[in-house]
């Protein structure tokens, strides 16, 4: 890596790990405000997941892709080689087989070569495992849970049953070997969430003992697993079938299977530390000096509690939200949503993204529905009509507010402007007509009619400029000022004079231009009109 004092590009975030980047030449500096850029992984996902339905047309779709790609790749900070390395690494992780992809991503490779080395290491391990001593189908079946057995194809189940009739039959080379080996590998790669859920299902029925410190009981653990039985309802039929089907596959009688189940069920309610009378005899534990069944009590001192206990507690919370119908959570504010699309829309409130722009005035919105409502101010459309009096409104909320005047006395109309308000809000509204300014700045004591105007004014004192131009990184305290500034980059002129067709970037320029036509109608000479223009 070249020596220098420059600042390297920011890390790429979780999921797609950072690429090794050379430092810039001495004296180079990161552009001001670059620290305010959002997480590159978030930008990458926005670039990859942009849908055509979210934009107004093909031109806007192309423009959005350019903007999102630039936010992700940061060409002002990275060289061409570094950008190519980033793209190749991402595509390499995408095309990897699923079992390799998860392993490589977990190790966070910093370059394509490192990712390839990790993939090769795992591939060799998997290939070596398939060449080891053959495992019998009985061994494979013993390692399968009931859920995994149910997921096996019917043909593979039949093949396993035929093979287990011969106790010495092995999983030989061929298609069947590959199929069963894949199942075993998938089992070993089960996620912690799935493992936690299976463990909770067994614990909630008392089928397995919970190993904690010596002397703890199952009742001690019930407090740590609140409402486990409610959150993890078990269906009896698959579980009961599992007690007979899989033992029968292994050649174990139903009585033997039931006796083993009863052994676990009873041990779940025992105090860990009591004597367990079995034919295997008792041994004295060297740590606590008590006699216990060999192997069972020893786990209290040698084995930590189930590795998924902490994950299981988190799983309970996740399942509760899933059953309530809000499975999608925002990582920034932890607010939950029913639909993934609602989560994407909400995340724009954190990123400040406003992809929907009005072609008439250039105002941008984060939601397409807000753009549709805004466009009615230009078209004059009023699609919502009152069925009682026939009055029409632009928005459904305005219609709902109007309909209250027909059926309730709690809502009154302002005599000054005709708007409808609740009685408690009407008095506040009337202050505006009286010239009252109830919202006062504590710094300069300037007063405002609206609270939102006060918030905007306070940014003058705090110096806060939350709105940034992604082209030149200049920042502004007002969103309207940012919109006007962005037109200097796009060349957009949304304000059109309907008399001569000339267009302008700002509404004030249009108003100043329209005075020319007004003076012409008033009978003034053209020379005087040009003189007024020069004097402005």
From Swiss-Prot:
Q: The organism sits in which domain of life?
A: Eukaryota
The cross-link Glycyl lysine isopeptide (Lys-Gly) (interchain with G-Cter in SUMO2) sits at 20, 207, 260, 413
Q: Where is the SCAN box domain?
A: 44-126
Q: Does the keyword Zinc-finger apply?
A: yes
Biological process according to GO: regulation of transcription by RNA polymerase II
Bias (Polar residues) occurs at: 26-41
Region annotated Disordered sits at 18-45
Which residues fall in a coiled-coil region?
none
Intracellular or extracellular location(s)? Nucleus
Instruction: Say where the protein is mainly found.
Output: nucleus
Cysteines paired by S-S bonds: none
For this UniProt record, the keywords arranged alphabetically read as follows:
DNA-binding, Isopeptide bond, Metal-binding, Nucleus, Repeat, Transcription, Transcription regulation, Ubl conjugation, Zinc, Zinc-finger
What do the Gene Ontology cellular component annotations say?
nucleus
Q: Which GO terms describe its molecular function?
A: DNA-binding transcription factor activity, RNA polymerase II-specific; RNA polymerase II cis-regulatory region sequence-specific DNA binding; zinc ion binding
Zinc finger C2H2-type: from-to: 328-350, 356-378, 384-406, 412-433, 439-461, 467-489, 495-517
Kindly give the PROSITE patterns that the UniProt entry links to this protein. SCAN_BOX (PS50804), ZINC_FINGER_C2H2_1 (PS00028), ZINC_FINGER_C2H2_2 (PS50157)
Record-annotated KRAB domain positions: 135-196
Note the InterPro entries from the entry: KRAB, KRAB_dom_sf, SCAN_dom, SCAN_sf, Znf_C2H2_sf, Znf_C2H2_type
* Job description of the protein: May be involved in transcriptional regulation.
UniProt cross-references to PANTHER family, sorted A to Z: FI01424P, ZINC FINGER AND SCAN DOMAIN-CONTAINING
Listed name of the protein: Zinc finger protein 394
This protein's species is Rattus norvegicus
